Amino acid sequence: VSWSRGLGDVYKRQAFILAVPSKGRLEEKSAEIFSKAGLPLLRDGARGYQGEMAGNGSVKVEYVSAGDIAARLAEGSAHMGITGEDLLREEIADFNSAIHLVSPLGFGQADVVVAIPDGWVDVTTMNDLADVAAEFRARHGRRLRVATKYAHLTTDFFARHGADDCELVQSFGATEGAPSSGAAEAIVDISSTGATLAANNLRIPNDGII
């Protein structure tokens, strides 16, 4: 759970806006959290995007995608929301000053990780990857490509490890398939168990958890 630090205008509005995930397990778990706290959420229809908190007319509930919740908190159009910390850190440049993390909820857990082909047997750390990137550019005349939906997190992490001689390729889904399709040499994506990465012959360097 997180909220925007810019709450000064809440009292000028009639409603406190709570943004929660609009579908799937995240929606179900979000509803369960509030229900257990004695604050059940009432959605306007199974597919509606508006709702309310039972017994509290000052709270307006809005059902949006997890990614959009981060953007809503950043712009101040939602005051509290349930979303992933990875999305918050990716979407909000001044994350530490703009957002207050209230509590981890224990569901939807996953890490943002660097993943490389299993065949790169000599690459076990990010320093190794930095060396490979330099060698790749010298040999092929172009930079090693990294497919990801997390451009900001990836840029910062790679720079901290001296592996910034890479080209980011924007991914719109199924990022784990980019190396096998030839769209990229490595990826940065979320992973909870590593099973999907393993199924695509990818692995995480020892220090590759962002």
Residue ranges and their predicted role:
Residues 9-210:
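Domain-level signature for soluble enzymes in the chorismate/prephenate branch of the shikimate pathway
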